[in-house]
Swiss-Prot record:
Protein family membership: Belongs to the IAA-amido conjugating enzyme family.
Gene: GH3.9
A Pfam family of this chain: GH3
Name of the featured protein: Probable indole-3-acetic acid-amido synthetase GH3.9
GO molecular function terms listed in the Swiss-Prot or TrEMBL record: acid-amino acid ligase activity
Functional description taken from the UniProt entry: May catalyze the synthesis of indole-3-acetic acid (IAA)-amino acid conjugates, providing a mechanism for the plant to cope with the presence of excess auxin.
Tissue: Expressed in etiolated seedlings and roots.
GO aspect biological process, one term: response to auxin
Amino acid sequence: MFVKSETKTRGGLTAWFALTSVYKSEQFKSMAIAYTSPTAAILCEDAFQSMYAQMVCGLCQRHDVVRFGAVFAAALVRAIRFLQLNWGQLAADIEAGELGPHVADPSVREAVSGILRSDAELAEFVRIECSKGDWAGIITRIWPNTKYVDAIVTGAMAQYIRTLQYYSGGLPIVSTSYASSECFFGINLRPVCDPSEVSYTIMPNTAYFEFLPVGEVVDATNLVDLARVEVGREYEVVITTYAGLSRYRVGDVLRVTGFHNAAPQFRFVRRQSVLLSVELDKTDEAELHRAVERASSALLRPRGVSVAEYTSRACTERIPGHYVVYWELLTESPVGAGDGDTVDGETLGRCCLEMEEALSAVYRQGRVADGSIGPLEIRIVRPGTFEEVMDLAVSRGTSIGQYKVPQCVTVPSVVELLDSRVVSSQFSPALPHWIPTPRSD
C-alpha cells in the first residue's frame, strides 16, 4: 500500500489520488490492526522506504499473515521482486533488530521499531529460503498461514495471474471488487472463482449507471439502464455520480455475464481504446493479452518459462510498420532463475508467429495479402526492466499504489529505456494463416 503526495488546485482544494485519500482517512487508520504494515510506513511518500518498511514488518509477523494482498496484482509482483533484490539487507536488519540508514524517515523508523526485534533464527530462515534461487511458492514458504492472494487481476492486470500462481504455490487469487477514482461499481459474489471468470455484481446505490452498446453511435438515445442490458453483450459504462459527474464515460468496456436477482453482473473486458495500429488493423488490450497468453502457454510454459510482464508499441520506423512486443521472462525453476535470455531464437520466432495467429483477420490480411504490415517482433528485456519503467513513471508523478504497466508505450524516454535493456529479439519467421472471406454479393 502506497501514497502519493497531494497537490492544491488554483482554488485551494486538495487534489490527490483516490487510494491516497483512502489510506489517509480516519476509517482506514482505525483498521490498522488488520495489516502488518504500520500506518507510518504506508503514508511514507518515499517508495523505497515505504516498501522496505512494509516488507520487514511482514517478515517479522510472517506467522500472522492470512491474506497476501494489494489493490493491483502488479504491486504484489513488485513486492516479491523487491524481496528478491533486498533479502540480504532485510535479513541483516532482522538479525540486528533495527533498521539500517537506508530508511531515514523518523516516523517510519519509530513505527517499525515497535515491531522489529533482533531475531537471528528468522534472519537465517530468510537467507536460506531466498538464497535457493527457487521462487516457486515463495509466498506460502515465508508466510505459511496465507489462505489466499487478494488483488485485482482483471483487465490489464490479467497478465500477472500466472506469475502470482507461481509465487503463491497455487493459492486462490481473489479479486473482490471493481472500483475507479470516479465511484465504486460492484463486488465479486464468487470470490474464489477462477481469476479468468471474475464477474462483478453492480451496486446500484453507488451511482446512476447507464450503458452504451459497443459499436453503436455515441448518442444519449442509445444509452440503456441497468434493467435493460442483455446477457452476452458488451457495453461501455457511463456514470452519473453523487459528486457531480454527469453521464461521464469511464472508458471501461464490460460484458454482461448474468444477473444476481435483478442486478446485472459484468466481466471487465478492456479499456475502450485501441493499443496498436499500423494500417487498417486495430488491436486492443484484450486481443493483445490473448495473443501473449497463447504464445506463452503453447511454447514457453512447457520449458518452465512464462511472461512476467509485457508491453508493446507500433514501430513505424521502417516500412512496412510492425508490432514490437517487449517481454520480461520468469524462469520457473532454480536453474537459470533470474536469467533474462532463457529462450532460444527459434522458440522466440515461433512465439512471434503464434501471437500473429491469435490476432484479428484484418491484421493477418495486412500481413499476408498486401504486405502492409511487417512481421511481429518480440524483444526480451533483462529482469528488472519493468521495475525501472515504473520508477520512471513514479518520478514523473504517478502514484506507485495505482501504477499499471502500460500495455502500449509511446513516450520516447520509455521506449529508449526498454530498447536499452533488450537482451535478445526475433521476428516472426513466416506468414500467419489467412484465407480471404468470399463476398456474399
